[in-house]
Structure formats: structure tokens, C-alpha cells
């Protein structure tokens, strides 16, 4: 039994190594073609994903104000379907005549390729949004690059917002730029990141995969910002105090000890900030 488990784990590791090799080969091919994503240092972003949805909802409400919803009462299934389709196409034509152009950037977390058109989900700091990628809109070469891209790659997308037939606000891509190539494989999306040890040791993966963890960090950042603003408005001054000290006092806790090579002396991790603030 142990031998079977070891063989299975070895096979899985071999598969992972092969996938990692493929990703590095894709990067090498991009670099040889003069499309090294790591050479791109700036990309103009006009909106976050949540901003796009808010902007489109407001624009839609303005353009379609007073337009009643389609009434399918008394229609059979086929007639109702045609009425809903006609209403959608009319609404879409009104919105497309005065489109909302946006530019976003984020990590691709999902991709579904369907011949000449594809869908993907782009995730940024404030959420995620679906993008619609058509070969005729972005060109054959770029579409081929997109089809070869992997989950975890970071894309810049320029286009206009629209609402799909299912009601989801999306972006119709007109320009796309591969900003960064993901060389590592993200955990499987459905089950998420459940390994507690990995979540703490590789916090960056936790922030990518778990929305709840990211929200905690965002809230923490906002709280610290408000505390700083509150104190700064009252003429408090922020100062830095030493983190490594010769004598860690102020409490009975046992300090962490290490050796400072540059000074050739033993130091301790501080316990209390109060002692230095009082000096």
C-alpha cells in the first residue's frame, strides 16, 4: 500500500514538473518572438473591475430610463423566447451606440475557449469581471497568444462594457496585452486553498485564491490608514523605533535572539515599543 501511494505521489509530481516545464517553454517562445511580458513596466488602467460594473449600471439606467421590461404574459414558449431576444438586441444596440470604454488589468482566473471566441474572468484588487475575446476583434496573432495563455497570467484589457444575454456585465476586448506570465500552477479553483500551512507560509497564494483573506488585508490597510489620518490631523508625529535591540525589556516574555553579523554582536527582537517612545 505504501509503495502504491509513493508511486502515485511520484507520478503526480512528475505531471506537475511537466506542466511547469511547458509554462517556461511558453515564456521562452514569447521572448524569442519579441513579446517578453516581463519587459512591460507600465500599463494605463482607467478602472477597477467593480468600478466598471458600477459605471455601466449607471450608464444603462441613464440610457434606458423609463423603458419597460418585456412582457411575455400570454405568449407560448417560442414566442416568449423571441420577444426576450428582440428586447435584448434592442437594448444592446442602444447601449453599443454610446459605449463605456474602459481599460483594466488583472489575473486571469478562468478561461473558456470556443473556436473564434472565448470568455475569461479577470481578477483585480476589487473583484473580478468577465471578458469576451473575439478573434475578429483583436486579430489572429493575439488571439492565438491568448488561447495559449495559462490560468494565473496577468492581462491588460481595453474594450467596452456590455451586458450578456444572461445579464452579466462583461468587457468586449478590443486590445489585449500580456503583462506577466505565470510560471507556477495555482491551486484547483473549485476546492480552493485548504492547506492551512501553505496559506500561512505562502500568503501570496492565499490572497490570490481566497477572497475572504484578501478582504481582511484590504480592511486592515484601510483601518491603519484611518488611524494614521486621525493622529496626523491632531499633529501627532509617526516615528520608527528599533526592532533589534541589545536588551529587550518592558515585559517578562522570552525574546527571540539572533546574531547581527555586520556588528558581530548578539541582539534580541524587541518586546515593547513603549521604552523607546518614552526616551
Protein language model features and the residues they cover:
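Class II aminoacyl-tRNA synthetase catalytic cores and aaRS-like
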Residues: 1-279
